[in-house]
Curated annotation (Swiss-Prot):
This is Acetyl-coenzyme A carboxylase carboxyl transferase subunit beta. It comes from Salmonella paratyphi A (strain AKU_12601). Zn(2+) binds at C27, C30, C46, C49. The gene is accD. Its main location: cytoplasm. The lineage of its organism: Bacteria, Pseudomonadati, Pseudomonadota, Gammaproteobacteria, Enterobacterales. Residues 23-292 form the CoA carboxyltransferase N-terminal domain.
Amino acid sequence: MSWIERIKSNITPTRKASIPEGVWTKCDSCGQVLYRAELERNLEVCPKCDHHMRMSARNRLHSLLDEGSLVELGSELEPKDVLKFRDSKKYKDRLASAQKETGEKDALVVMKGTLHGMPVVAAAFEFAFMGGSMGSVVGARFVRAVEQALEDNCPLVCFSASGGARMQEALMSLMQMAKTSAALAKMQERGLPYISVLTDPTMGGVSASFAMLGDLNIAEPKALIGFAGPRVIEQTVREKLPPGFQRSEFLIEKGAIDMIVRRPEMRLKLASILAKLMNLPAPNPDAPREGVVVPPAPDQESEV
């Protein structure tokens, strides 16, 4: 037996550690490897570089509203392939794939509840659902959110994260821009606050309608906000755009948005602003996250 074989015979093979998938993730900005559970506790904000990663609609609403107060609205509304649209793939197949991937029926989730004990209606986009694109169901759910806010005489908050209108629904998608804007006019007539929170990215028909119609337009840090994307603009005007173009820090310098708020500070900031606008006592930052339990809304059959 050679000396190499003798060494080999004395080596005990080590057992390969098995790490479940999804335990670790990597920051999109700095590349830091992060523990998934810790990142979720930090509201999907990188603890090293403060990069705000994309957050699911449900996690966002649960992080905003008081525990035990959330009631979902418009969940019975489902998209339909009325036009029998097909590009490289059938629209109904794209819908089925997005629904399976996200667990959502469409790209907007609406809930009513309380924020530091104050009644609020909140909506949030699920960007993972076809890029948060706006179709008939998104428009109908947003209008439902406005109607609920009017009924409860309370504020409305919407977190936008969208690539714009859903091309598979053609003009029916574009119609939602006017539909949602008209609904918000009723909020203005009643004197009820509507706060729009712009997250990364907020583009196209969503930015050209209700996303920029807030009484206050708040953005998260480094969020991409605009109509056409930077690459499309550069190709059209044939000029190099300035650094940070269409990012929230660039837009606040130009007066296009009102403020930038970090995600961990968003809940208290929104509660403070809404309390002031509704002429209510300022929220206690140390108060536990327990709100008034709101009774479930009665089941209603609605058509988009």
